[in-house]
Amino acid sequence: VLLGDDNAANYIGNQLLGTSVPVVFWGVNGLPLKYGLVEDLDRPGRNVTGVWQSGYYRESLDLLKRLVPKARSFAILACDSETSRPNVKMIEQLAKRDVLPLKLGEIIVTNGFEDFKRRALETSRRVDAFFVLNHDTLRDAGGRHVEMLTVGRWYLQNIRIPEASHEDQFVYEGMLLTANDSGYNQGYVAFEMAQLILEKRVNPGRMAVRTPDRGPYLVNRLRAEQLGISLAESMFMIDEVVSEAAALGIGRNR
């Protein structure tokens, strides 16, 4: 059984834990030890192993700093979800270790769309950049779910400071940049592990949890132009320039 994302790995994985069914997870932001799926990252111990999405937050902020040298501080902006919370904690830990190129200021984690908008606008006047994480579990004042692209459209139309993100999907949405924690790479590695289990009869309990290599540095040309950021002298550090913004209805949707 292959399980993608924290919710599936936690809730379904734990139902299969200790059975004869091999389980491979991927796209897990939280530490796998937290969910009780593995006893050790190097030697999981039972029938579950997989791919840990450890993130390239520092690399994303490094790229932002190189594109916007005057940036000194940033805030985190995210919905309050099972997926977002581990990302927030990882960035907080990096900030406490003082290994980030920008100083972490405020942390905005909410599922209220009005609260999200108000705090984002207020905070954008006090910091130089945002780190935008997942924003797909917000609700309006009436309790109705607000689509991620609707949130993204509001953000791109109202926030005038640069942002980093952690996955390519957000750059294709319209956010400025990422050092991509590639979902494709995670899925590929997960299927490699599953193949070893099925064809080579490798014991998942002896297969170390893996973290895939960083994906490409992506920058959104449209957002850069909107913010007045020139990419002309920075192309050597960019792997891929994106010229679409799904949240604004520009280009193909992903």
Model-derived regions: residue spans:
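Short hydrophobic alpha-helices and adjacent helix-cap/hinge residues
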Residues: 1-254
